[in-house]
Amino acid sequence: MSGAEGTRDGASPTGGSALAAYTTLRLGGPAAGFVVAEDAETLADAVREADAAGSRLLVLGGGSNLVVADEGFDGHVVRIATRGLRFDSVGDGLVQLTAEAGEDWDAVVAETVRQGLGGLECLSGIPGLTGATPVQNVGAYGVEVSELLLSVDLLDRRTGNVRTVRAEDLGLVYRGSVLKHSDQAVVLRVRFLLRDGGRSAPVRYAELARTLDAEPGSRVDVAEAREAVLALRRGKGMVLDPADHDTWSAGSFFTNPIVEAADLSAVLSRIGAKVGPDQRVPQYPASDGRTKLSAAWLIERAGFGKGHPGPGGRARLSTKHTLALTNRGEATTADLLSLAREVRDGVLAQFGVSLAPEPVLVDCAL
């Protein structure tokens, strides 16, 4: 097992140093123990050893969807640093991609585009590691991982064994899966099914279609689709840039709320009473007859504009995108959570709609 890896400043994230160097929010206190796993066997062994010792365990990927308490984590952290990509033709113009969990996600997407494989390009620019994508059922610009995922190799912490689980058995839903709500399995590698030929997945997202000057549902050059997605994400502060505090975030902090069919009319009426009957409420079909609303739209209409609460705030909404809560350089996790509560409670008070956090909260809560 490899030893503790240095942080950006060369310090270990144990003792008095912080896990902040391993999260895109740059927040979080120290860990009691920290190891780096550079291959799947080491990763599995590190998890087994922590479990055998009865230690609390945090498996750390890219830290892009993580909010860690200021007090830190009083257990062992295993940082995933496994590498490896494999492409196998399976016939009919289809290619299976196998990626180790520690591969940087955007680098994986870039390589698929370089090879002319369509499917993942709309997920360009999303920070984090590949192993996290099925856990969150990562999605953007009209595409979700669930549409392309074949299977994952998991370490089952209950038995200590490694097993392959098909995508359909992972309970993949909007921004979630059975893996997100249980700590009993660790993703070791992931398999996707992609299409050869240099064309993108059908362009479904209206904003992306306009950017590409493409008809909704059409396919475009896969490289052009990737560049358009990256440009859109940069405009919203959603591509990591150490010099831009708008990217010191966990991405979208709240998921888009999903409203049951029986409740939709009452919810829309309440929103209309607040914003005016002539304002169109963005809504999108979800599973089982439900409707997805836009969290960003609700946040803005509840009075929380870009950059809230304004200059001087240590934690602020991004100046580019209201759905991102950001660290302006000197924030604490407590600052961030205070802002999150203010926004969540404000939307609930105005519209009766509950916003749920998307990141994983480690030893802290809203």
UniProtKB/Swiss-Prot annotation:
Chief location of this protein within or outside the cell: cytoplasm
Keywords: Cell cycle, Cell division, Cell shape, Cell wall biogenesis/degradation, Cytoplasm, FAD, Flavoprotein, NADP, Oxidoreductase, Peptidoglycan synthesis
Pfam families in the record: FAD_binding_4, MurB_C
GO terms, biological process: cell division; cell wall organization; peptidoglycan biosynthetic process; regulation of cell shape
Cofactors named for this entry: FAD
Reactions catalysed according to its record: UDP-N-acetyl-alpha-D-muramate + NADP(+) = UDP-N-acetyl-3-O-(1-carboxyvinyl)-alpha-D-glucosamine + NADPH + H(+)
A GO molecular-function descriptor: UDP-N-acetylmuramate dehydrogenase activity
InterPro entries, per the entry: FAD-bd_PCMH, FAD-bd_PCMH-like_sf, FAD-bd_PCMH_sub1, FAD-bd_PCMH_sub2, MurB, MurB_C, MurB_C_sf, Oxid_FAD_bind_N
Family indicated by similarity: Belongs to the MurB family.
Function: Cell wall formation.
Protein name: UDP-N-acetylenolpyruvoylglucosamine reductase
